[in-house]
């Protein structure tokens, strides 16, 4: 029983905070199988929101965006999520500005779509997502094999459609 509990997008934003997921020197490898589609979705959304945050800061939009986020949470009658504790040494907090919201909620649609397209085309890494290993070698499936294979296919189709060429959506584990 080891690892990091990632139950929400905000958990993933906190985990990856301070690491620019779209930097040319960054490549993330996730050795995860059953929940791979959800973790991959979290990862891609974190990468996009980090780039939205960089855009917001580069264009001096911090105050405007903060007001939008506050209004969203005031309307919901909820407390805005925040990072608790001290940031680790060397962590610049990248990725924490948009806790509780996504870039598409605070930026114009055209701006967000451009940032999204650039982010998913730039991000680098691999997710294991080897459902056959889960089924045949470990018997630890959380989804039926048929459904898991369909999700793998859907992810690959999304990668092709969106020209995601620097991220591998499956890595077959040959050692189990």
Task: Please annotate each region the language model reported.
Residues 1-176:
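Catalytic alpha/beta active-site cores
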């Amino acid at each position: 029983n080891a690892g990091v509990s990632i139950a929400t997008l905000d958990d993933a934003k906190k985990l990856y905070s301070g690491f620019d997921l779209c930097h040319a020197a960054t490549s993330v490898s996730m050795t995860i199988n059953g929940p791979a589609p959800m973790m991959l979705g979290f990862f891609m959304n974190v990468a996009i929101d980090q780039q939205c945050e960089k855009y917001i800061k580069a264009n001096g939009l911090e105050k405007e965006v903060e007001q939008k986020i506050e209004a969203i949470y005031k309307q919901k009658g909820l407390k805005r999520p925040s990072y608790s504790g001290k940031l680790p040494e060397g962590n610049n907090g990248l990725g924490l500005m948009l806790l509780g919201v996504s870039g598409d909620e605070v930026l114009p649609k055209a701006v967000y779509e451009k940032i999204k397209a650039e982010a998913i085309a730039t991000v680098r890494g691999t997710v294991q997502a080897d459902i056959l290993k889960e089924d045949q070698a470990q018997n630890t499936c959380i989804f039926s094999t048929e459904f898991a294979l369909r999700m793998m296919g859907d992810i690959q189709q999304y990668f092709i459609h969106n020209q995601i060429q620097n991220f591998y959506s499956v890595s077959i584990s040959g050692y189990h």
